[in-house]
Amino acid sequence: MRDMIRFTARKTVLAAGALLCCTALTTPAFAQAAADETTEDGKDIVVTGSLGALPIEGVGTVFGFDKTVTETPRSVSTISAEQMERFGITDIYDLVAQSPGTFTNSFFGVGGALDIRGTPGEIYFRGMRRLDNPGNYPTPIGASERIDIVRGPASPIYGPSKTGGYMNFVPKSARVQGGSYLASPEGEVTMTGGSWRKADIKAEMRGPGKIGTQEFGYSLFAEVEDSGSYYDNMSTRQTILQGSFDTDLTPNLRLEFGGMYQNYKGQQNGGWNRLTQDLVDNGTYITGSAKPLDTNGDGQISQGEINAAVPGGMSIFGGFACGGGVFASSITDACFTSSPNSALNLTNVGTAKLSRRKTLTGKNDRLDNKGSTLYADLIWKGAGDLEIKNQFFFDSYDNINENSYGFSQFHDSYAIENKVVISDKFENDIGKFAFQVSPSIRYTNFKHGDDFNYEYFHRVDLTVGYTPASDRLLSTECDCDYTNYVTGHYTDYSIAALADFDFSFGLDVTVGARYDYLKAKSAYNIGKMEAAQVASNRADGIPDSASGNKGAWSWSASANYKLPYGLIPYATIARQSTVIAGQGAELYPGDIAGQTFVSASKLYEGGLKGSWLDDRLYAAVSIYKQKRTDYNIQSVTVNQSVETKGLEAEFRWSVDKHLLITGGYTRTKVYNLTALTNGTLFSFFGIEDLVNVSDPSLYLGGQPIGLVPITSKSDSRRAGIPTNLYSLTATYAFDNGLALSASGVKVDSVYSGQSQAVKLPAYTKIDAAISYETGPWLARLVVKNVTDKKYFRANFTELFGSTIVLPELPRSFQASLTYKF
């Protein structure tokens, strides 16, 4: 374990010491902590003033067993609906202040999923895995009762998953705590307005119902948004509908069903192009126009027009045109001074101070997504604690993404899963023992197309906007010349088993295993693809279609021990399989033929948790190492082959009924194992990479590309993820209905890309809110980025990090008015 984490001794001791110091406050309270979990009449306790932030309720989304966060031998945090309301949390980026181990690079400005432990995370809905969402649409959070953030790969019971972790969204229930229906309907309506023409209205209602003699509970949610944006050419229009229903069919059989629909219309945001250190530090931008290529006068440049000017396109690989090689250092001015590469030269070159509003988003760009999620659970209760649950789940999206600089894609994909969970519990003098067996089948159908071979960020001068010299004719516009156009499906047949042995002397052991057998089929639609790409695929031995199958084992073993003074040390070791799918849940024929569409990761984690002061104070610290087992298999966009080492610490303290304080610390180092093994990583070259080209205007009409040398482990560090991140939140509620809250995150400086050529500054971002509640009315004002800090977020660091960066939002205001009934 000593070489597992390479931290300074001082920071490790401080993290553990902070946790141990809690015991000094709580020794007298620990003896009664276990007894205080319920009152004498069996009712659940409620810690007033905690906003549901304390880990006193069962969370089944980690192992499937109803354990509290304190009892769970994994690093996990929960964010309640009350926390989200009080702190004005509106998107997944706001969750970083509430949970350690989380931070997100920009995936073209769309909040699809958090980076967890430095790699893209996944989204679960009621414990069922949704389709991949790296940046297909902003994940809605407003209808959630709770969000669980689990760091590290999922338990075997949940199936193949990514290395970093996942967020599980728990929708608002049709029942109250304890399982009964509400006595009468209740609900609320909220209107929100704010900076940059923010306009949003949402309504929710919960209550009991009856059809004939059949009683049921319901929870309904609707949200409509029509907002502008700080950035030029951007807006958000979306409708979200969600419903949950619950009824007892018989005394032993319960039905839970519902779903969510989201219709989102917006845009991606590539941020600033022509990236230099001077642009980041001082806002100094290189201006200039690309040479015209639009020979037919239709106002756009087509692939044919590009190839007519520069055969093979304007993405020039390496310095071979001037006697160089594959690395950026071999490229000189001479590569771009003669035909045909001189077509990359800019004209009318100068400099200007660039507004942070001016980004790569064009007037005609669009990101449209229609998503549907459905579920139906049948739960049968047998003798004792025997339970059989049948879970049906459906998730789909129909997505189109168009960007004027030269990237487009679409997805039309869905997944259907049916899982049976058979569980039972036993208790005797030795302890409590719980078991689960779960067969399941999941079918995924995909249709995906993309267009990225002619992606030229720098042709557009952001001070001017798109012109016929920079606006590309996209494959989704002509329905032609795609880089990939692939259809297919895959089915996962699986069986999983879990067991929990909670011994009465304090030891708790959880073990589990799963076997997945995947059958896959995929085929390119050759007629829709660019002929040159088809020829290149075939020359590389990539088949036009393929089918195949592969099996994969997953397992986990965890243990914790209840020590005196409220301390619970734990350890976990696990191996989890993962399916290497793309941005639209697609598999490619080459991966199926090569048996490389399934890989696995291993996790080693140890930590210390505790809960004191009648469960008013919770603290945890963990260290971990997790890595992919196959270094040569990765999706560079959504499922990288990485090794991550880190430390996570957090505390949550409900001081009294007025004051709640939380804090977190994250230390993360992520290494790209594929790059480290190969010694190189393919990348777009930025201005700061091309150190031997004296004038960047020589090539900004196109895109030099090549290989970044990876000669050491430090070279393989994933860019954009800070080594150290600190967070602190506090909220105080007065007796007269007034409440104040604030949150802050302190983030280390990071490199924007894998080549480590441009450094983004460290920053501290503070958000604050004030609310007043009287009778049925609640008014709230939220100020985000209170100090108006200028900061940046790295964008797709492995590929584009040296070429583009996203300038983040300045200070903004949101005001909302809620009526509760």
Model-derived regions: residue spans:
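Structural signature of Gram-negative outer-membrane beta-barrels, strongest in the C-terminal barrel
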Residues: 432-444, 449-451, 486-627, 644-645, ...
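N-terminal Sec signal peptide and the immediately downstream disordered periplasmic leader
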Residues: 1-87, 93-100, 808, 820
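C-terminal beta-signal and adjacent terminal beta-strands/loops
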Residues: 661, 670, 746-753, 771-821
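Outer-membrane beta-barrel domain signature, strongest for Gram-negative TonB-dependent receptors
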Residues: 239-436, 443, 618
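Short acidic/polar hinge/loop motifs at secondary-structure boundaries
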Residues: 113, 128-153
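Gram-negative outer-membrane beta-barrel transporters
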Residues: 616, 620-627, 638-755, 787-788, ...
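Repeated loop/turn-to-beta-strand initiation elements of outer-membrane beta-barrel proteins
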Residues: 213-216, 252-257, 385-388, 428-433, ...
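Outer-membrane beta-barrel translocator/receptor signature
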Residues: 143-145, 157-242, 247-255, 372, ...
